[in-house]
Regions:
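N-terminal helix-cap/turn-to-beta initiation motif at the start of protein domains
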Residues: 36-45
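Short aromatic-glycine motifs in intrinsically disordered, low-complexity regions
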Residues: 91-97, 144-151
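Central antiparallel beta-sheet cores of small beta-barrel/beta-sandwich binding domains
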Residues: 48-132
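Edge beta-strand at a domain terminus
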Residues: 140-142, 148-164
Length: 164
């Protein structure tokens, strides 16, 4: 009965192909799964929004350098600064009277597990440096930036929107 043998052989090959295909799908998903599940990082271009006025304040480019997130002002467009090239008049030390555009305002933030360590943020409007914490929200489309003195409870937050 060669036809029964042939049918059994074809069924075995067919089931082997299905099994092989299942194994390949599982392997691909296992390999790609971590990439799909990775959270966004704070690196990117962010539009700041004033926590006092609710108006857009400018753009900050956040980059990762040796595990540290650093934020640099790339544009200022909020109304209390009619000057398109405002200076940090209230800053102290080397930053006194320097252009706000190009100024590093965020530094020292590092990834720590699923969150980010405390860093420092400069408020160029006040010339003050605060401790800060950041948190990604809305699947990485928003960044909560909390500046504080002492403990996070004694501070204020801004929510920045990702531009790229």
């Amino acid at each position: 009965m060669p036809s029964q043998r042939l049918i059994k052989c074809l069924l075995w090959v067919d089931s082997s192909r299905k099994t092989l295909l299942r194994h390949l799908v599982v392997l691909v998903l296992a390999w790609c799964g971590p990439a799909w599940g990775q959270a966004s990082t704070p690196a990117g271009l962010w539009q700041t929004v004033s926590d006092r006025t609710g108006q857009p304040g400018g753009l900050v480019r956040v980059v990762e350098v040796d595990g540290e997130y650093i934020g640099t002002v790339v544009a200022v467009f909020s109304p209390p600064a009619p000057d398109p090239h405002p200076l940090c008049n209230l800053c102290e030390g080397d930053l006194k009277d320097k252009p706000v555009v190009g100024m590093i305002i965020l530094r020292g933030v590092r990834r720590s597990g699923d969150s980010y360590s405390t860093g420092r943020i400069l408020d160029p409007d006040e010339g003050q440096v605060y401790k800060c914490r950041i948190a990604l929200l809305d699947e990485g489309r928003k960044l909560e930036v909390r500046g504080f003195i002492g403990i996070p409870l004694l501070g204020r937050s801004q929510t920045w929107s990702r531009k790229e």
